[in-house]
Structure formats: C-alpha cells, structure tokens
C-alpha cells in the first residue's frame, strides 16, 4: 500500500511538472557569433598582403574556409529552430528575422554565409514570389536576406566607439596585484619575439604576432618554418597562453576582486563600458518582446512577429558577453577568446498560463561543435536550466552605463 501511494504521488508530480513545462513557450531568440576564419590583419614577415588571396584577397578578409564555417553554423541554427522546434518558418520571412553586423567585410560576409545555411535554396521558395524565375541567370530558390550594418555610433555590438574611460581603466588595471605579473610576462615575450624579427624599437608594444601567427600557420605553415628558423609549436603555444589572461583583463575577467586601493572596482567598470550596452540592449528587446507576446494581437510593436535577432560580430565582443554572464571559461581556447564561428544563443520563454518569464543560454564553441545548453553554468541562474528573466534584468541593471555610454565614456575615473 505504501509503495502504491508513493507511486501515485510520483506519477502526479511528473504529470504536474509536464503540464507546467508544456505551458512554457519559446517566444524569442537573440544570437551573436564570431565571424569565420580570416586572413591576418597585418603584414608580418614572411607573409604579406599580396599572399592573402583567399575570399577576395586582402588583410583581415574572410577566407573560403571561414565562409564554410559560417554556413555550417547557419545549418545548425536551421536544424534547431526550423526543423526541431518548428520556431522559424522554413524560408526567409522578413518580419521574423533581423540581422546586424559590424562594418567589416568579414562580419558582413560571415552573416551572409550563415544565412545561406539558415535559408538555403529549397522547394519552400516559390518562383516569381521569393526569387525571379530566370533559370539561366538565377540559381533556383536562391533568395537574399538583408544584413544591417552598424554605424559608427552603434556601440552595442562593435565596442569600437571611442571611450576615454576605458583607456583610463586599463591604466588602473596595472595597479592590481593580479595583473602586473601577467603584463610583465607579455612584455618580456614581446621583447624576445621582437628581437627575432630584428626590431630595434617598439618591442614592448609589439602585440600583433600571436594573432598573426594563428592566421599564418593555417595557410603558410611550411613557409613559416622555412623562413623563421626560431619559430616552433612550443613558441606558438607560449604566445597564446601568455596573452590569454591579459585578453581576459581587457574585458573585465579577473580571478580575484579587481578593486584598487582607492576603492574603484575595475572589473565592474570595464564590463559597463565593454559589455554593458549589448547586455542591456538584449534584455530590453527581450522584455519588450515578451510584453508584446502577452498582449497578443493587441501588440502593435515591430517585435510582434519578430522571432530571431542576430549579431555578426568579433571574438572580443562575444567574449565580453561571456564574461558578463559569468562563463568566460566555456570559450575553451588557448588564447581565451572564442574560436571562429563560435556563438551565443539566448532563448526567451514565457509561461502562457502565468506569464512567468525565463531565459536559456546556449553556446557553440566553434567549427565542428554542436550548440549546447549552458544555462545551468551561469552563476546568476543558480543551477537552473530555465532561468528567471529577473536574473538577467538584475545583471543588466548592474552593468548599465549611466547615464548613457557616450557620457560615461567621457567621464573621468
């Protein structure tokens, strides 16, 4: 009898849980990803701009491999949100999706490559409705999807707006016990490598080689070994791991409390000017969308039918958001910053019965990896796999640049 009672209670609990979960509906997705593999951004012996012929040629340009990486990511997004969840329609619908990019060829073409995977030519596309029927001059089923490019005053994604305060904060970082030893290691390595290149000045600030080597070795590894007798895998590895903690500091990631002797919380202040804008933008847009979903047909906002909002950005941008969310370690790379084609997916859910609001965070590490749920790893979620939206709201309020990013960036410490 006792066993029967426990069985009944367990069955009831499972039924209640299932019913509760069935009322939770995915309403909105906001995603941000790093562009695909690119050429080096600078000339560095023995490889120069003329050697970078890939993807149209030039320094910093997306390569064909990078296009393929982004196309694969587009297919993964389609698999999840079109095929599995039936959340997006199978073909491009202008009111359902919106895509932004920073004003760089590599991020723009990355977005286009991703969209070619998300909305590939298919039987869902109707000739003379979705594309012109011109068999000899137009690939059947191919449709364009717009990518909106950020202007110079849009700091949410690019983090490239001038910020004097950020420059001052970097100076304050050097007063922290955690930081100075790591910076010293970087400077010593810079001097060593600069000597190999026969540099006579600017050695301390010679910081481009770790990233440049990463690009060069992918396409010109034999040339590097032939022309650089001192170069080897051990030195490459040393450069990546030596720079990793410093790259973390630049986005506000510290292992210890980053408070100066005067009481300035350097870590918090860096996050405000680096990731605060995009975190607040994402939260505010999600909150407005969920308000709209609650209103149903009475909602007149442009968000009424919008389901997916995407940012095509850079490694430091994606990393800044990981730092803000408290999960920088999931980047899982030698240099600490996200790999090519890595991405964050923030899903926003609503209980249609109670109007309770939740969010989930998913992450894709890079090429040839799946999109995985990492919600329970967020410190603000306390192990929950469906995190209350209030946790994200509190984070956004904590990191909000006040009164606005432009004014804050001009404000002295």
UniProtKB/Swiss-Prot annotation:
Disulfide bond entries: 381-387
EC number(s) given by UniProt: 3.1.3.2
Entry annotation: catalytic residues: 35, 315
Pfam family, one: His_Phos_2
Catalytic activity: a phosphate monoester + H2O = an alcohol + phosphate
Superkingdom of origin: Eukaryota
GO molecular function: acid phosphatase activity; phosphatase activity
Keywords from the UniProt entry: Disulfide bond, Hydrolase
Coiled-coil ranges from the UniProt annotation: none
EC category: hydrolase
Family, per entry: Belongs to the histidine acid phosphatase family.
Name this protein carries in UniProt: Putative acid phosphatase 11
Species assigned in the record: Caenorhabditis elegans
């Amino acid at each position: 009898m006792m066993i029967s009672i426990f069985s009944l209670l367990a069955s009831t609990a499972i039924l209640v849980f299932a019913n509760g979960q069935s009322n939770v509906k995915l309403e909105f997705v906001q995603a941000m990803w790093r562009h695909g593999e690119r050429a080096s951004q600078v000339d560095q012996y023995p490889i120069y701009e003329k050697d970078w012929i890939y993807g149209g040629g030039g320094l910093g340009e997306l390569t064909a491999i990078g296009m393929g990486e982004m196309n694969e990511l587009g297919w993964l997004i389609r698999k999840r949100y079109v095929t599995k969840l039936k959340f997006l329609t199978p073909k491009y619908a202008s009111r359902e999706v919106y895509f932004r990019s920073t004003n760089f060829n590599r991020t723009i073409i990355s977005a286009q490559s991703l969209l070619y995977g998300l909305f590939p030519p298919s039987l869902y596309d109707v000739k003379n409705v979705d594309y012109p029927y011109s068999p000899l001059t137009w690939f059947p089923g191919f449709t364009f999807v717009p990518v909106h490019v950020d202007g110079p005053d849009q700091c949410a994604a690019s983090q490239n707006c001038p910020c004097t305060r950020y420059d001052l904060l970097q100076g304050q970082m050097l007063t922290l016990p955690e930081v100075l030893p790591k910076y010293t290691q970087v400077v010593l390595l810079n001097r060593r490598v600069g000597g190999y290149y026969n540099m006579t000045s600017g050695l301390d600030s010679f910081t481009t080689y770790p990233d440049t080597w990463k690009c060069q070795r992918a396409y010109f590894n034999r040339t590097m070994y032939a022309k650089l007798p001192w170069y080897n895998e051990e030195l490459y590895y040393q450069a990546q791991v030596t720079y990793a903690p410093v790259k973390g500091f630049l986005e506000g990631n510290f292992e210890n409390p980053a408070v100066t002797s005067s009481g300035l919380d350097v870590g918090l202040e860096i996050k405000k000017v680096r990731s605060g804008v995009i975190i607040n933008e994402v939260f505010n847009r999600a909150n407005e969308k969920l308000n709209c979903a609650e209103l149903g047909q009475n909602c007149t906002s442009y968000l009424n039918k919008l389901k997916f909002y995407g940012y095509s950005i850079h490694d430091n941008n994606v990393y800044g958001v990981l730092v803000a969310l408290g999960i920088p370690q999931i980047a899982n790379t030698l240099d600490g910053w996200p790999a090519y084609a890595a991405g964050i997916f923030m899903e926003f859910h609503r209980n249609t019965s109670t109007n309770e609001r939740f969010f989930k965070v998913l992450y894709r590490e890079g090429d040839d990896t799946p999109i995985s749920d990492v919600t329970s790893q967020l410190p603000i979620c306390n192990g929950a796999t469906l995190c209350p939206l209030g946790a994200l709201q509190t984070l956004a309020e904590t990191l909000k640049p006040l009164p606005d990013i432009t004014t804050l960036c001009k404000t002295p410490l």
